[in-house]
């Protein structure tokens, strides 16, 4: 991606009017982590009325990533106006306000509105974390319970179980089993790291002995 992004940088895209081509370049620049270049390409497409609501959403994301909050807010309002029934507007606004260091209580309000319309394990977990930070222990526990019940496994289920353990509240048998599996896996990983370290240490010792033997032969 980085090589393709560098090549794209050197080309003149001002006369390109094909949306699919510009969209590809925007995606390449984003994948390469060059958000300023991706933003500039997205602005080019936006000024030509290409891409529709998806481009407005993406361009707002780029403005957020480069800390241009004034333009991000303006575009967010445009997106929200065009997407009155699109629940993703809550996530876009959440990303914007979080980047602006909004109070946790405000972020909770945004994610609660999103949760009313959409069930997503990532944002359910983030909501649970915000409940924890704002002292809403019961809401945090309940959200963790629902996340485990509805999704059953995966990274956010495991995070929810660990967060509930952090709360110090009673866990269900299913949650205890998940936590036990997490701890067992962690122990295995630590054991493997220790084994690898000892193998490397022994290898280094053997090489040192070999060098010593060669020096003795030279003498």
Model-predicted segments: where are they?
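TPR-repeat structural position
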Residues: 1, 35, 69, 103-104, ...
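Intrinsically disordered, low-complexity acidic segments enriched in Asp/Glu and Pro
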Residues: 176-219
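TPR/TPR-like (Sel1-like) alpha-helical repeat modules
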Residues: 81-83, 135-156, 161-186
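Alpha-helical adaptor scaffolds
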Residues: 23-30, 43, 54-119
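Solenoid-like repeat scaffolds
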Residues: 9-17, 43-51, 77-85, 112-119, ...
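Canonical tetratricopeptide repeat
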Residues: 21-22, 56, 89-90, 124, ...
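Single-residue signature of alpha-solenoid repeat helices
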Residues: 4, 38, 72, 106-107, ...
